[in-house]
């Protein structure tokens, strides 16, 4: 089974990243992309990592009020000017997500629909409305304490049902 659909495998990957590599933000990128790419959402998306883009004429469309997000979600068409449906901003699991964070606010203003996650907590904003806020676990005394698998199932269901366009 896929890491993106199996909570035990997902937890193990987060824990390994946490223990072996201080779970730096970039450790989450492949996990986040897999969760989105393998969602059962009927709206097929192109998930593009723009986290290390430099400003250029080509990349300007991905540059918002808060700079580049980590990912942009585009229409799944093989065209350069595919419509942008939203973005994803990731933080390290050791960083608590702040709904008033300037970077998040800029991404919401620029891209409208934003998934905001540190791997343990997942939030989705549609404009200024927080549509879901699901906590898979938290760090307590330097160790990840996981919540019930039902939270994971709820997260997958919510992601599967996001209306991107």
What are these regions (language model features)?
Residues 1-113, 121-165:
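A short, conserved, highly charged catalytic patch centered on acidic carboxylates
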Residues 118:
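Charged, structured surface patches that assemble and position nucleic-acid processing machinery
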């Amino acid at each position: 089974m896929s890491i993106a659909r199996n909570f035990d495998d997902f937890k193990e990957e987060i824990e390994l990243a946490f223990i072996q590599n201080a779970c730096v933000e970039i450790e989450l990128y492949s996990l986040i992309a897999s969760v989105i790419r393998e969602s059962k959402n009927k709206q097929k998306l192109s998930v593009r990592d723009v986290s290390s883009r430099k400003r250029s004429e080509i990349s300007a469309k991905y540059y918002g009020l808060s700079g580049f997000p980590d990912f942009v979600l585009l229409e799944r068409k093989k065209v350069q000017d595919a419509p942008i449906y939203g973005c994803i901003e990731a933080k390290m699991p050791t960083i608590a997500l702040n709904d008033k964070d300037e970077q998040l606010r800029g991404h919401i203003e620029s891209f409208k629909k934003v998934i905001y996650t540190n791997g343990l907590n997942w939030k989705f904003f549609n404009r200024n409305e927080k549509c879901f806020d699901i906590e898979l676990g938290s760090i307590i005394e330097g160790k990840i304490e996981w919540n019930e698998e039902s939270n994971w199932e709820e997260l997958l269901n919510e992601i599967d049902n996001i209306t991107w366009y």
